[in-house]
Amino acid sequence: MVVSKMNKDAQMRAAINQKLIETGERERLKELLRAKLIECGWKDQLKAHCKEVIKEKGLEHVTVDDLVAEITPKGRALVPDSVKKELLQRIRTFLAQHASL
């Protein structure tokens, strides 16, 4: 029972993602997110944090994978709620307009 629900969820996510790609909405959402994150200073905050980590550990001792692993949780936490809410609203509107999924 649990497996079939997970499978249905995965199928639904795949169908939604496919529709987002086909309509070009996925790219528009990514552009909106990129602009909003720059606008609120998120990109600069993360860049500064990356520099701190590299300075702490030394350039020779940090791989890109290390940096990503260290930065990702902070990056997610720093996304303002207003940006999350706006993106979620855009996705909900899109889904309402394409309810045939």
Swiss-Prot record:
Covalent link (Glycyl lysine isopeptide (Lys-Gly) (interchain with G-Cter in SUMO2)) residue numbers: 74
InterPro entries to which the protein is assigned, alphabetical: TF_ENY2, TF_EnY2_sf
SS bonds (residue pairs): none
Tagged with keyword NAD: no
Keyword Acetylation: yes
Gene Ontology molecular function terms on file: chromatin binding; transcription coactivator activity
GO cellular component: DUBm complex; mitochondrion; nuclear pore nuclear basket; nucleoplasm; SAGA complex; transcription export complex 2; transcription factor TFTC complex
Main location, first listed in the record: nucleus
Pfam families: EnY2
GO BP: chromatin organization; negative regulation of insulin secretion involved in cellular response to glucose stimulus; poly(A)+ mRNA export from nucleus; positive regulation of DNA-templated transcription; protein transport; regulation of DNA repair; regulation of RNA splicing; regulation of transcription by RNA polymerase II
Location of this chain's protein in the cell: Nucleus, Nucleoplasm
Record key words, sorted: Acetylation, Activator, Chromatin regulator, Isopeptide bond, mRNA transport, Nucleus, Protein transport, Transcription, Transcription regulation, Translocation, Transport, Ubl conjugation
HAMAP family: ENY2_Sus1 (MF_03046)
Function as written in the Swiss-Prot or TrEMBL entry: Involved in mRNA export coupled transcription activation by association with both the TREX-2 and the SAGA complexes. The transcription regulatory histone acetylation (HAT) complex SAGA is a multiprotein complex that activates transcription by remodeling chromatin and mediating histone acetylation and deubiquitination. Within the SAGA complex, participates in a subcomplex that specifically deubiquitinates both histones H2A and H2B. The SAGA complex is recruited to specific gene promoters by activators such as MYC, where it is required for transcription.
Family the UniProt entry places it in: Belongs to the ENY2 family.
Subunit structure, interactors included: Component of the nuclear pore complex (NPC)-associated TREX-2 complex (transcription and export complex 2), composed of at least ENY2, the isoform GANP of the MCM3AP gene, PCID2, SEM1, and either centrin CETN2 or CETN3. TREX-2 contains 2 ENY2 chains. The TREX-2 complex also associates with ALYREF/ALY and with the nucleoporin NUP153. Component of some SAGA transcription coactivator-HAT complexes, at least composed of ATXN7, ATXN7L3, ENY2, GCN5L2, SUPT3H/SPT3, TAF10, TRRAP and USP22.
Designated name of the protein: Transcription and mRNA export factor ENY2
Taxon lineage: Eukaryota, Metazoa, Chordata, Craniata, Vertebrata
